[in-house]
Regions:
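Residue patterns forming the tRNA-binding/recognition surfaces of aminoacyl-tRNA synthetases
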Residues: 1-143, 174, 222
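Conserved active-site neighborhood of enzyme catalytic/cofactor-binding cores
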Residues: 13, 20, 73, 97-102, ...
Length: 247
């Protein structure tokens, strides 16, 4: 439904508050919990004579790994995205030209399909563990769009924030660090490069000796999530592929 709406440029209306109750945008049942509202809608349809039938059916519902009693449901919220077209453009040629070989070769098609239909990468996760998003928000009046800076640490963020008009006297305590963590694959895709400090110290003795390696043995289910992204990182930061064969 969401993708269909995007295709036709439909307005996105979020009827839920962060706590799962209905917001003012819903118009009806405002402030009530969504689970109770579902039951109430059925009752109201029945009372209005609009309910055609009620029947049971089997559906696959995901549940939270942290709370097995909580169903996982989609919700509109702000996320961080990485533009991926550039990375797809630099990661596809090495495979199509045979610089990297897949065994069996049929998985080249899988790889190609992913990269030729690339979407931007949602890199933020609402988790308490992982690498934290390096963004710091400035104090913002209610209803105004939040301003932020991206920095290695709070001290660097403070220096950047003070360069913004109106925030020359801001303090470190007033900065709010983004609570989200990076997608686990965001650190994994850098593994061949970062293992030997290839980003901060390119051309050092270890990475010059070990990079690229010969073979990668992995599963076909993560050809895009890990294999393709490692190739992207290698091409971007080392200007060479991280391995020659993928099994």
């Amino acid at each position: 439904d969401y993708n269909l709406g995007k295709t036709h440029n439909l307005e996105t209306i979020d009827i839920f508050n962060p706590d799962g109750t209905l917001s003012q945008a819903a118009g009806l049942y405002v402030g009530q919990d969504r689970m109770e509202v579902r039951k109430q809608i059925a009752k109201d349809l029945q009372a209005a004579g609009l309910m055609e039938k009620v029947e049971n059916y089997t559906n696959k519902v995901g549940y939270s790994e942290r709370n097995p009693d909580t169903a996982v449901e989609p919700r509109l919220c702000m996320q961080w995205y990485l533009s991926m077209q550039h990375f797809a453009d630099i990661a596809l040629p090495p495979v199509l030209e045979g610089k990297i070989k897949f065994h069996p070769q049929k998985y080249v098609t899988t790889y190609r399909n992913w990269l030729e239909n690339i979407d931007d990468w949602c890199i933020s996760r609402q988790l308490w563990w992982g690498h934290r998003i390096p963004a710091y928000y400035l104090p913002t009046a209610e209803g105004k769009e939040e301003q932020f800076v991206v920095a290695m640490n709070r001290e660097e963020a403070l220096q950047k924030a003070r360069q913004i008009a109106g925030f020359e006297n801001i303090t470190a305590e007033e900065l709010r660090h983004d609570e989200d963590a990076l997608d686990t694959w965001f650190s994994s895709w850098l593994w061949p490069v970062s293992l030997f400090n290839g980003i901060l110290n390119p051309g050092n003795e270890e990475i010059s000796y070990y990079y690229p390696t010969a073979d990668l043995v992995t599963g076909p289910d993560i050809i895009f999530f890990w294999v393709a992204r490692m190739i992207m990182a290698g091409q971007e930061y080392i200007n060479d592929v991280p391995f020659r064969n993928v099994y």
